[in-house]
Amino acid sequence: METNRKPLTTAKIKSMKKEGIPITMITAYDYPSAMLAEEAGVDMILVGDSLGNVVLGYDSTLPVTVDDMIYHTKAVTRAVKSAFVVTDMPFMTYHGSLDQTLYHARRIMREGLGKAVKLEGGAEIAPAVKALTQAGVPVVGHLGLTPQSVHQIGGYRVQGKNSDQARELLKDALAIQEAGAFCLVLELVTDELAAWITDQLSIPTIGIGAGPSCDGQVLVFHDAVGYESKPWPKKFVKTYVHAGELIRDGITQFVNEVRNRQFPAGEHTFKMDQEAVDRLYGNKGN
């Protein structure tokens, strides 16, 4: 557990690439998960639109709204003192006019109190990235598997398996960097491509299912701690604890103890003194 850390900045995050210090990022969606991430010493916390899947019960990220992202970012930022908080901009909030993009980002930053926003996409969203950075909004890019485009790309598939696709992704990465992004997430891309992009960029890359060559790594909180009792196996995920099983077992024990009248026991119960009891019910001797 790390204490008394200075708040991270975009400049510090970029310098970590130059210094060869791996960057750690994890998602968080509420006060308790953000507090645990902060106490663990995570560098960056992503309030991801993955909350649609793991918190709100949707089958994709597409239904998540700006109001959802603000609500959860506010909870996260209340817990964080030093980690750098990034908020996803939801589906179709940065694909219209630049004025609309700035409006949505302004709401997320002002109301959610995060420090940056994350956008999915390549060269086609470079104008949005440029408009945001020129307005003073730090931007994290996201390439490879982009969940908001999952239907367009044909499902959750590894990207960059052939040379043509790899070259296009590098072009996209350079375009996002040129537009002003200070960091880039690479999701589900081949190890070789991630290494190539990381070498070609001056900004840090953070991988999820992108091999060990990225400048940092990110995992979804629920995957990392095994929060789901029956998690969907993913090759690129490492589960460090199985919190879901412990939580389920604890709740099961609670249910059993209540039904068997074992809880609450004496140590969980508050008592009146005898004089107060006598006054409440009446003293039979009077």
State where each predicted segment sits:
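Alpha/beta enzyme core
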Residues: 2-274, 278-286
